[in-house]
Amino acid sequence: MATQQVDSRRQVAAEQVAAQLLERRRGSHCDDEKQTLLALLILVLYLSTEIWGSSWEVSERIRECNYYQNLAVPQGLEYQTNEPSEEPIKTIRNWLKEKLHVFSEKLEEEVQQLEQLAWDLELWLDALLGEPHQEEHCSTYKSHLWEWAWALGREHKGGEGLLEISLSGAEL
C-alpha cells in the first residue's frame, strides 16, 4: 500500500511537471518569435563581421597592387585604363569565396547540432508525456532516458516528488 501511494505521488508529480512543460511550450510563442528574431540579428551581425571584419587585409592588398602600378609611373611606363584592375577584384572574390565557404561550414555544423538538440528534446518530451515514439534515434537517447528514469525512482524527503528533480538531472 505504501508503494502504491509513492507510485501515485510520483505519477501526480510527473503529470504536474508535464503540464507545466506543456504550458510553457504553449505560452512561449511570443518568446519563440523574439528568440528567432534575435537569432537572425546575430546571424546578420556574424555575417557582416565575417565579411567585413578583416576588410583591412583586402584594403591592404589593393593598396599593394596600386603601389606597384604607381612605381611604374615615374619610370616612363605610364599605364592608364578606365577599367579596374583584375588583380584586386580576383583577390576580393577569392577572399569572399573563402570566408563564405568557412561560414557555410560553421553554419551547417550549428544547424546539425540544433537539429540534434531539437530531436533529443522531442524524444524526451514524448517520453515524459508518455506518448509513443516509433523509432529510437540513438543509444544516447536510451542513456539519457535511463538517467531520467533513475532520477524519477530516487526517494525524495518531504514527499515533494518530481518537483525537486532538476532538469539538469535528465540532461537532453
From Swiss-Prot:
Identification of the protein by name: Small integral membrane protein 23
Side of membrane Cytoplasmic, spans: 1-36
GO cellular component: plasma membrane
Database matches in InterPro entries: DUF4635
Coiled-coil spans in chain: 96-128
Keywords: Cell membrane, Coiled coil, Membrane, Signal-anchor, Transmembrane, Transmembrane helix
TM region(s), chain numbering: 37-53
Extracellular side: 54-172
Organism: Homo sapiens
Major location (coarse): membrane
UniProt entry tagged with the keyword Ligase: no
Tagged with keyword Transmembrane: yes
Membrane-protein topology: Single-pass type II membrane protein
Name of the gene this protein is made from: SMIM23
Subcellular location(s) of the protein: Cell membrane
